Amino acid sequence: MSTVKITTTLGDIVVSLYDETPLHRDNFLKLAAEGYYDGLLFHRVIKDFMVQGGDPDSKGAPAGKRLGMGGPGYAVKAEINARLFHKRGALCAARLGDEVNPGRESSGSQFYIVWGSVYKPAQLKQMEKQMQQNQVTIAFNDLVAAHKDEIMDMRR
């Protein structure tokens, strides 16, 4: 896992980049090394949820300019991983919604950092276990529903 320090006028933010998403990790590291993010704004801030940055159009943008559509001219192939969910402190790739982006590709440069709720690592681990158990339960219930008649015959 790689870490990156984002220096802002309000202090530093250290984020982790997962090895399980190598295309996104390598792209972010490349852009950071090139200085792509230097001087860019966090152009979207939603209180108690997230901040978004990475739009090159935000560099030197006048107040009131609509931001959020700029990028390096390419997208990053989706690397969806159910284990990596949007928990507090997570660095996430921004993307357009599924209805206009069925491939679920990410912006080439825009990202957001989730603030949301504060959880202890043990709480996050328990939530992950519960989600996995829920998936097993759903699969089991689907099988039971599909074979209900056979199961009832076996019980007789």
Model feature map: region roles:
Residues 1-156:
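Cyclophilin-like peptidyl-prolyl cis-trans isomerases
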